[in-house]
Amino acid sequence: CCGVPNAACPPCVCNKTCG
């Protein structure tokens, strides 16, 4: 979902900073 205009996941998923 990262890099897609309609990204369905929070930015932290792409930044790998979740949790």
Curated annotation (Swiss-Prot):
As one GO molecular function, the record gives: toxin activity
**In-chain residues carrying the UniProt-annotated modification Glycine amide:** G19
- One GO term of the cellular component aspect? extracellular region
Q: List the disulfide bonds.
A: C1-C9, C2-C14, C12-C18
Q: Which domain of life is it from?
A: Eukaryota
Q: Which UniProt keywords apply?
A: Acetylcholine receptor inhibiting toxin, Amidation, Disulfide bond, Hydroxylation, Ion channel impairing toxin, Neurotoxin, Postsynaptic neurotoxin, Secreted, Toxin
Tissue expression, as annotated, is:
Expressed by the venom duct.
Whether Disulfide bond counts among this entry's keywords is: yes
Tell me if Secreted is a UniProt keyword of this record: yes
Q: Where in the cell is it found?
A: Secreted
Q: Which residues carry this modification: 4-hydroxyproline?
A: P5, P11
Main function: Alpha-conotoxins act on postsynaptic membranes, they bind to the nicotinic acetylcholine receptors (nAChR) and thus inhibit them. This toxin blocks the fetal muscle subtype (alpha-1-beta-1-gamma-delta (CHRNA1-CHRNB1-CHRNG-CHRND) subunits) (IC(50)=66 nM) with 1500/2000-fold greater affinity than the adult (alpha-1-beta-1-epsilon-delta (CHRNA1-CHRNB1-CHRND-CHRNE)) subtype (IC(50)=96000 nM). It blocks the currents completely and dissociates rapidly from the fetal muscle receptor. Has no inhibitory activity on various neuronal nAChRs.
| Family affiliation | Belongs to the conotoxin A superfamily.
Q: Domain remarks in the entry?
A: The cysteine framework is IV (CC-C-C-C-C).
| Name of protein | Alpha-conotoxin OIVB
Q: Origin organism of this chain?
A: Conus obscurus (Obscure cone)
Q: What is the lineage of its organism?
A: Eukaryota, Metazoa, Spiralia, Lophotrochozoa, Mollusca
